[in-house]
Amino acid sequence: MSEIKIEIAKNREQYNEEASSKYKVGMVSLGCDKNRVDSEIILGKMSDEYEITNNPKNADIIIVNTCGFIESAKQESIDTILEMANYKINYKCKLLIATGCLTQRYGEELKTLIPEIDIMLGVNDYNKINEIITEFIDGNKLATELLNYSDENINEGKRIITTQRESAYIRIAEGCNNFCTYCIIPKIRGKFRSRKMENIINEARDLSESGVKEIILIAQDTTLYGSDIYGKKNLHVLLKELSKIEGIEWIRVLYCYPEEIYDELINEIACNEKVVKYLDIPIQHISDKILKLMGRKTSKKDIINKIQILRERVPEIVIRTTFIVGFPNETDEDFNEIIDFLKEYKLEKVGAFTYSQEEDTPAAKMDGQIDEEIKEKREEDLMLLQKNISEEINKLKIGKLYDILVEGYNGKCYYGRSYEMAPDIDANVLFESNAKIENGEFVKVKIVETMDYDLVGVVVDESCK
């Protein structure tokens, strides 16, 4: 058990003019897709008592769901809170709420830094958000309240989906047990804990009934799903059960730690037609020296072996990964191991970011911190290489047919994604059609041209599913 502070400012007189049920609520969600799910749950909990608006300028209550993962994310969160604080002067905002990882980590500092914040919530306080707002408005609370909570808690419940209606994320677990030396997430989010399978299936069924065609499974480590509550890893069973839901056409899995990918999971990916042949595998580095310093539970040999197995057993598999460059003590030789690895194995989707020295992490205290200029140069070199690899891979797609999940029309052409493309992070397929096509439909498209990352195609069948 631990205590989470909910800081409530004293200047509440201005909020007594109207009943809370008349207020409009606007949400600004920052950070990862797991944070987005939290934002959707918050809106779901508030939707019966408040009117939801997607324009903060029209909102009486503004919620900023922050990210506190790396320095740039923290700065973006602070800048956004300050921007929304100005809405209390220039627009309708009467109540500013900050929540999420940054407030969980830096609640006291934020209270001093940004006194315009009226309420601060930690990452597990969402169940009481309506009660807290009502008490604040009614003036019945003192400046500070303490809530006890167990890190067994998982935020669940009704959601207001904020993504394209044809796709939605489903968080299957909360927290993390990995304790990588550069990462603060386990201290913020707590230990790894899986959701019950029946709750996930019910949520997926509800999403399907609302028109969702693609569900994207997320967690800090999806491959560990079930190990804590069922006694063994059970992601393959979850995939099998989810694929039985009528209306769900694609099931995508993100955040699979390489050392936890297991045979039954690979078999299910290979054999289940609804499970797209796409895995997000956060490798982070390929040098054994750096992997050890990062506290990763794998090795270069094991990573390469897992990639080879996946490609042998699932020939059409698309692998996405990320690398951290400029980690403490990373030499040119260590960095070049990543470069050589990418040249040889040509992963389809790669992202990179520079190491961020996060306080309260072991890596922050390591000797051998790398200059920012060197970090940025390594990131630039890596992404330039990957751009060339992506162009090479894309050229091989010319003439191929893909089922495309349509996501919209930009005024000139339609756009959507093949199974090789995850929402928000990957490219699109652009195509024209004489017929009107609705979002969420599947069409068969032949690729005729490539861009740096996007593909251009022509429709050969305007209703393939």
Curated annotation (Swiss-Prot):
Its cofactor is [4Fe-4S] cluster. Its EC number is 2.8.4.4. SMART domains: Elp3 (SM00729). Residues 162-392 form the Radical SAM core domain. Keywords: 4Fe-4S, Cytoplasm, Iron, Iron-sulfur, Metal-binding, S-adenosyl-L-methionine, Transferase. Belongs to the methylthiotransferase family. RimO subfamily. This is Ribosomal protein uS12 methylthiotransferase RimO.
